[in-house]
Amino acid sequence: IVKTIFMSPSPCIKIEFQGGDPSTDFEMVKYIIEEAEWQNLFKKRELEFVICTNLTLLNEKMVKYLKKHNCMISTSLDGPKDLHDTNRPLQNKNLDHHAIFEKKLQMIRGIWGDDECASALMTTSKYSLGRFKDIIDEYIRLGFHNIFLRALNPYGFAKQHKDKIAYPIEDFVKNYKEGLDYIIELNKKGTFFVEGYAALLLRRILTPFATGFVDLQSPAGVGIAGAIYDYDGSVYVADEGRMMARFKNYYFRLGN
């Protein structure tokens, strides 16, 4: 897979580890990072790494390794404790997911010495509606300077559990407007905070520069701006294609 990744003509290559949670097989993460770095001695690309994890399994040794290899951390934060734990329950019901998240985040930032080493994304379930202000406040409390208010994608497990977590898109738009208004007011009062989707749209509208955001590219950036390599070697044009394959729809699989 790493050899195939370097067949890309792009001068910049970013390898992002997704899941499940890739920290459950951290030895494989290490192998891929080190193999990519070795191949890049000859390929001479601008090489970056990102690992997507809920942080629960990360320990100091892992984080020090990630820092050494400049592998950034992307995680999930859905809001205050009650909302985050509702959206993302752990198998062990006796564990406090949000408390673990906050403790691990502090540990990561302490090792890196930089708050920007870890970024967070939220998922908007029906339990999130009406609570965008609380969610934004929680991001600020935990030291994040931006949020990406995004609707639920109707693919994969989200589609499977739509009766529990889905909502009309009109409800999301209403909440998004309220959330964006709140963020604008925060900035007016001196708290720097960015709504990521609005920033992408405004950059496209007001400047001649591209954003690299595949969903907004025309023609579509799938299979061009990136490719998804699954655990079995299957290659998809986008993450949504991989999610659809979980339910036996292989339309967006490029090959194996």
PLM features: what roles do these ranges have?
Residues 1, 22-86, 90-103, 107, ...:
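Canonical radical SAM enzyme core domain
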Residues 12-16, 46-50, 72-74, 117-121, ...:
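Structural preference for beta-strand elements that scaffold enzyme active sites
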Residues 6, 66-67, 140:
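Non-catalytic positions within long, well-ordered alpha-helices that form the structural scaffold/packing
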Residues 14-19, 86:
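Short acidic, glycine/Ser/Thr-rich loop/turn "cap" segments at secondary-structure junctions
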Residues 82-102, 106, 110-235, 240-252:
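Radical SAM enzyme [4Fe-4S]-AdoMet core and its adjacent flexible, acidic
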Residues 4-9, 37-44, 109-114, 184-190:
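Alpha-helix termini
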